[in-house]
Amino acid sequence: MSVGRRRVKLLGILMMANVFIYLIVEVSKNSSQDKNGKGGVIIPKEKFWKPPSTPRAYWNREQEKLNRWYNPILNRVANQTGELATSPNTSHLSYCEPDSTVMTAVTDFNNLPDRFKDFLLYLRCRNYSLLIDQPKKCAKKPFLLLAIKSLIPHFARRQAIRESWGRETNVGNQTVVRVFLLGKTPPEDNHPDLSDMLKFESDKHQDILMWNYRDTFFNLSLKEVLFLRWVSTSCPDAEFVFKGDDDVFVNTHHILNYLNSLSKSKAKDLFIGDVIHNAGPHRDKKLKYYIPEVFYTGVYPPYAGGGGFLYSGPLALRLYSATSRVHLYPIDDVYTGMCLQKLGLVPEKHKGFRTFDIEEKNKKNICSYIDLMLVHSRKPQEMIDIWSQLQSPNLKC
């Protein structure tokens, strides 16, 4: 190779080396410039996310504290900012006394209806003992557990259910068992002392569950929690649960046929009923479901009307776990919807649940009940009559 060609080759190599060094220097300069400059990597000057502002309504405010406590990320942020230095009040898990702090924490507390004052004072209380238990009720794994909300004076309703749709049966390997859910009805609520009659009833039928708490409309959510606790300890192997009121008619045979048709995947998270969407609290003080703005604001999650709903046994256990992460709410079906929301589930609407009754013209037509699962409401004698007609071998629809 000639000297001239070697010089040209060497010059080319030196030029390429210079270009490479130039590129390295330029990249280094750009990376050392202000990251917030045009075209550069943007570094936020402050936190890009802030915890939501503190709600004004008492329930929302207390629930937000609970949400942060059970969320590891939010809990860490709250502790760093000093917003949540200690755990939430967990007295509802052990010790129960009136919570006098609500008198100052809830705006205009003294002007609230008495039922709301009582609810707020005992909002955190859940540790109520069983006065009447049925520890052997689920000795044989139930296929379907019927749980009926009732009050002590409703003897006729309970007996009508026993003689109709609530009969305990054992067909093949499928067992249907029944319990009635009761609390105490003290004299201050204008109830007579019916304890002797209740004891006789319980001894005879072995289907009463009764807890040591005041049985009121606003305490139905408490009844729900106590029942789910009982399921988790005394009936954890039930495959399915129907829970409803004592003034509904239930086509138990249709429910059993439906349950037997389900796939395993469908049955796992089953929760069906007459589902209500995009509802909110009533603000009319004259209404039974009145909720003041100082207590709760916002839209309710989807929920199944409290007349009755059907769900899987495994889901009942998960629901009980969720109840510890949701403060009690005065309306029990809404509360159940809140617990489902915690589990990431939405109740499914089923046309067989008619919690607002059927058309007047169809009430006397027994064929109208063939494909129904539940209809609200019916008197005790009507329950017996409808059930008897549905069992008739001569029924043709």
Curated annotation (Swiss-Prot):
One example of a Gene Ontology biological process annotation: poly-N-acetyllactosamine biosynthetic process
E.C. code: 2.4.1.149
Name of protein: N-acetyllactosaminide beta-1,3-N-acetylglucosaminyltransferase 2
Organism: Mus musculus (Mouse)
The keyword RNA-binding is assigned to this record: no
Lineage, broadest ranks: Eukaryota, Metazoa, Chordata, Craniata, Vertebrata
Residues modified by glycosylation: N30, N79, N89, N127, N173, N219
Expressed in which tissues: Expressed in heart, brain, lung, kidney and testis and, to a lesser extent, in liver and skeletal muscle. No expression in spleen.
Short name of any one Pfam family annotated for the protein: Galactosyl_T
Cofactor(s) named in the record: Mn(2+)
